Structure formats: structure tokens, C-alpha cells
Amino acid sequence: MQHKLLINGELVSGEGEKQPVYNPATGDVLLEIAEASAEQVDAAVRAADAAFAEWGQTTPKVRAECLLKLADVIEENGQVFAELESRNCGKPLHSAFNDEIPAIVDVFRFFAGAARCLNGLAAGEYLEGHTSMIRRDPLGVVASIAPWNYPLMMAAWKLAPALAAGNCVVLKPSEITPLTALKLAELAKDIFPAGVINILFGRGKTVGDPLTGHPKVRMVSLTGSIATGEHIISHAASSIKRTHMELGGKAPVIVFDDADIEAVVEGVRTFGYYNAGQDCTAACRIYAQKGIYDTLVEKLGAAVATLKSGAPDDESTELGPLSSLAHLERVSKAVEEAKATGHIKVITGGEKRKGNGYYYAPTLLAGALQDDAIVQKEVFGPVVSVTPFDNEEQVVNWANDSQYGLASSVWTKDVGRAHRVSARLQYGCTWVNTHFMLVSEMPHGGQKLSGYGKDMSLYGLEDYTVVRHVMVKH
């Protein structure tokens, strides 16, 4: 397995402390990787800064060609990437290969095209004798911090728009799941000029802090927890860096009496438990109108009970393990606290799986109340709660009564209600009669404590640029 860092176009061994990387399906150590030293972090940033002098002046065509080449090599090595992701994250291999790899390739190809469509406003004379124009220019060095739930996907979401806009990047994947990013480093080094992409390994304290606080870094992009976002924003404040934050969610799923219950059950069975629920947009907080509440709980419980947890390389496996032992304990604690309330009923699941690995049973909890922690706090595991509601006004208020604001969905056959409720929900995305669907052309991002800034789409590309005014006297 490729375990070297990419700094200034060269693969080099880390000079810091060695850290174990685990296989969550077994609990075994896959390998140990040496972290980047503080000197290597500095070298990576300075290499990116030096490379920006030329890369920032390249044409969109040149940048697009590089992104397309990277997309091609990822596609060609799709099986290798999927196997690494499966071993390091515990994802079902078929899901990694069939779902994630094509989406990752598409992200790079989308931004290759978008790079050639980014324009400033047309020139005009707003002062007599002077012509003004608006430019969208790259910022410089971008520090990108990727999470452990979708390591390669999130690396793509961060690298593609930043590079397309003409920035240079220093990427730090999660120390829990670094293997696909390090493999990407091996392939990218021969496509992009030295220093344009740098990929490091290490923990937040030892590598993340010196990276995000570096004076030559002009922007920090994070997908992670609220706590990590707060830390990075504070850490970057003294140098007034731009920050781009995607900080998790607790998606409300509003099911009205007139909804297609079979579609809801099928949807939540998939969208609430995909990737073992380790997804910021997971359909995890259901509000069911009282007329269909009992039916939904019964049918959904039966459906969730059929989800198969198992070995990642088994074609029939639907849920793999959680990412780490520490995260397994967090999920277990959240469910135990819910059970201890006395009014929350475990419909199915509610316990760790016996045996090796970090497995938690797919869990459905009914009877949750609005103020319960299981409703208000992100669990980030295969755990879905159901809360009954009376009417539209009540459920909109409850849905918005959350510190999160990333994703939501509304299930109803009433088109007017779908529009009305969607307009009032304080979430970056609202799906109607579906959930979880993402495409490269549409923006992804939240509000409130879920963060700010957009991934994907032309809006995502614009986030990695600075607007400049140039005025020419005639």
C-alpha cells in the first residue's frame, strides 16, 4: 500500500511519529504511517505557494486537461481505489466500486468543464473615460481537510474546484482513513506540475494545526465536525483566512399522512443507513404525521431488520462497520442514552454486533420527543428516530428547531404543500419524495452550524475564487 506523502512533486516518507491505520471490519492494524513533520508541512505549503506563480496563470483549458487526466486514471484504477476504501473504511466493496468511484470521476470531469465556463461580469463604462471589468481569480494556497466517512469522494470535492479555479492545494485526509488519498498522490504527481497538489498524513494537532495556521495559506476548506470547524475558524482568525465549512447535519424527514408509505420505507431503508449511517445528509430524524405513524413504524422496522451487516467483500453485505472503535462507542452511548429515557422504544437493533470489527446493528427508535438528544444531536451511525407530529405548522417548527441546517426531505402527494414546506425549511437542500440524491451540477452545503460555502456546482467553483475589479483609464 502506498504510504508516502506528496510534497513538491515527490513521494517522501513522513518524518513524524508513526500512527496505526486500522481495518474496521476486523480491528486489525493494516499498517503504520509516519506523520508529516512540522518542517514537511511548511515545505508543502511553500511548494504550493511557489507553484501558484505559474499554475494560477494557466488557461482554463490547461487546468481542465489535467483534471480530465486525473479522472481517467482514477477510473482506470477504480478497482484498486475501491478495495483500499473498503479495507480502510469498512465500506461494502460493491458500494465503493459501483456507487462512489463513478461519482468521484464525475466530480473531476464536471469541474474540468466548469473551469472553462467561469466568467466575470462584462466590461462596461461606469465612469466616463474609464472601463471596468470584474475578474474571478484564484486565491493562492488552499488547505483542505477531508473527513473519514467518504475519504476519496471528499478529497475530490475539495481538490477539483480548487484546482479548476487555479489554486494550489495541500490536502490532509483523515488520519483514520488516508489510504485512497495517498494512492491518489501517487497517480496525481505525474499529471500536475510539482507543488500544485501536495498530500500529507497526520493528526489534527500535529499536521492540521500548522497547516491551517500557516501564513501562506489563504483559504481553509473543511468537511468535519462542528468542534473541528470551531477550532479551525479560531485558529485561522489571526491571519484572516477564508474558510469553507461543511460541518455535519441531522436531516429531518417529514412524512405527511398522504405520503406513499412504501416509497418512504424503501427510501429510509436506503438513505438512512447507507455507509452505516455515517453521512451528514442521512435520513435519520423522521417526523411522521399521526395518521400514518404506527403504520410507518411497523413497516419501516420490518424493513430495517432485513438490512444485512457483514464482511465488506461479501456481495450481499449492505452495511459495513463503523469507522473506528471510538466511533462505535459514541454511537452505542447515544443509543443507550435514548433507551434510558423510558419513552423511546427500540423497534429493531439497538446494540453492537458480536464478534470482530466495529459493527453496530441497524437501529430504529420510535417515540422520540423533540427535545430528546437522539433528535437534536448527530449520531452519525445506523440509527434513525421517529417522532409523531400533528400538523404542518408544528412539524416545520420542529424541523427547524435544530442547530444543523444541511439537508432535509418532505414526503407528500400534495404539490402545494411540498412547495410551501420546502420554502420554509432552513436547510441547504430539501428533497421532495426522495432523499440523499446528489449531482455534480447542483450545490451542496448548509447553514446554521452545518457551516457555509458550497461544494459541487458552479457555486462551489466560485467559492475558490476572489472577485476583483480592474479599471482602465482611456
Swiss-Prot record:
Matches recorded under Pfam families: Aldedh
Pathway assigned in UniProt: Amine and polyamine degradation; putrescine degradation; 4-aminobutanoate from 4-aminobutanal: step 1/1; Amino-acid degradation
Active-site residues (renumbered): 246, 280
E.C. code: 1.2.1.19, 1.2.1.-
Family membership noted in the UniProt record: Belongs to the aldehyde dehydrogenase family. Gamma-aminobutyraldehyde dehydrogenase subfamily.
Xref: HAMAP family: Aldedh_Prr
UniProt protein name: Gamma-aminobutyraldehyde dehydrogenase
Organism whose genome encodes this protein: Shigella sonnei (strain Ss046)
Upper lineage: Bacteria, Pseudomonadati, Pseudomonadota, Gammaproteobacteria, Enterobacterales
